Amino acid sequence: MFRGVGTAIVTPFKNGELDLESYERLVRYQLENGVNALIVLGTTGESPTVNEDEREKLVSRTLEIVDGKIPVIVGAGTNSTEKTLKLVKQAEKLGANGVLVVTPYYNKPTQEGLYQHYKYISERTDLGIVVYNVPGRTGVNVLPETAARIAADLKNVVGIKEANPDIDQIDRTVSLTKQARSDFMVWSGNDDRTFYLLCAGGDGVISVVSNVAPKQMVELCAEYFSGNLEKSREVHRKLRPLMKALFAETNPIPVKAALNLMGFIENELRLPLVPASEKTMELLRNVLKESGLL
């Protein structure tokens, strides 16, 4: 589907409504700086608080702006398999290139339940499916063995966004899934683990940081793929303060604040999320200035 950087793009709001004008500006910023894919309505896109009509508007506008230049992957996960399938079919109808399907949260399925969830969906769509493993938010963890089973059996499940920060799990997930199917892709779901995942044989990152610093995140991956390990490590180290600052509060609170400081969007979220504290705002101002982004 893609190698490199897929930006998990924010959803801008203004006076409680979608701000498509600011959104277009942000999408073009991503395209101009060479990102390899856009992930719309993921965690960073505040998908739980975006309604069905808004989803359609946002996905349709994204596809219009991107115009086939890079893949557009749409977040379509819920904790109901049937509701998830409904969102997948909506994305398919609109012309998305793939769907990001988070593991069912709150109801805590077993490993067999996780496998059956993805099997059910994969049998009912032709879209490429990306498994999204983020145990810190969902309460369930896709074990490397389960990821490998999915890779072996479900051919239109194209990869996994691995947001478990455990380095050992990252390594095992990459190793076992690639053994099961050589074209199965593994992307980091944590910006600060991107370099480590690449070293383990992974394929890139679905990134929050690239909302703000797309050029730098693209460079991190591109240098690695070109064999310039030291340069990639250097970019990673330079980005560390920004990576840390953008997770000073719950994502996407800091990244929206940063984009506001950069003049891209209003600093507006939907409840239960609230804007960043002044302490975080000051941290972001300083880090953005030090990074040459402000």
Swiss-Prot record:
Compartment(s): Cytoplasm
Positions of pyruvate binding: T44, I206
Site feature location: Part of a proton relay during catalysis: T43, Y106
Active-site feature positions: Y132 (proton donor/acceptor), K161 (schiff-base intermediate with substrate)
Enzymatic reactions: L-aspartate 4-semialdehyde + pyruvate = (2S,4S)-4-hydroxy-2,3,4,5-tetrahydrodipicolinate + H2O + H(+)
Pathway participation: Amino-acid biosynthesis; L-lysine biosynthesis via DAP pathway; (S)-tetrahydrodipicolinate from L-aspartate: step 3/4
Enzyme type, top EC level: lyase
SMART domains: DHDPS (SM01130)
Enzyme nomenclature, EC number: 4.3.3.7
Matches recorded under Pfam families: DHDPS
Keywords from the UniProt entry: Amino-acid biosynthesis, Cytoplasm, Diaminopimelate biosynthesis, Lyase, Lysine biosynthesis, Schiff base
Record GO terms (molecular function): 4-hydroxy-tetrahydrodipicolinate synthase activity
Highest rank taxon of the organism: Bacteria
CC annotations in GO: cytosol
GO biological process terms on file: diaminopimelate biosynthetic process; lysine biosynthetic process via diaminopimelate
Similarity section: Belongs to the DapA family.
HAMAP family from the UniProt entry: DapA
Role noted for this protein: Catalyzes the condensation of (S)-aspartate-beta-semialdehyde [(S)-ASA] and pyruvate to 4-hydroxy-tetrahydrodipicolinate (HTPA).
Subunit structure as annotated in this protein's UniProt entry: Homotetramer; dimer of dimers.
Name under which the protein is recorded: 4-hydroxy-tetrahydrodipicolinate synthase
Gene responsible for this protein: dapA
